[in-house]
Amino acid sequence: MLVRLLFASRAAEPAAATIASICQHSQPRNAERGITGVLVCGDGVFMQAIEGGRAAVNSLYGEILRDARHRDVVLLHYEEITERRFVG
């Protein structure tokens, strides 16, 4: 079963450095886990949509909650989906 999760957070460090770090580490792992999505950042605030299998998305969101690069993480939306909106 596929799900889509949308969350917002604040960058713990300057956003440009944080985005580079997140992308460098997450892109290969997300591909291995079958996770797709989109990350948007402005004024030190992140908004990200994550899509994939329920277990993989839930696990990744748990990692994000524990990630020191994110502060004030807020879950905005979570739904079951039949197809991805953001493909690799």
Walk through the language-model features, giving the residues of each.
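Charge-rich, low-complexity N-terminal segments
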Residues: 1-88
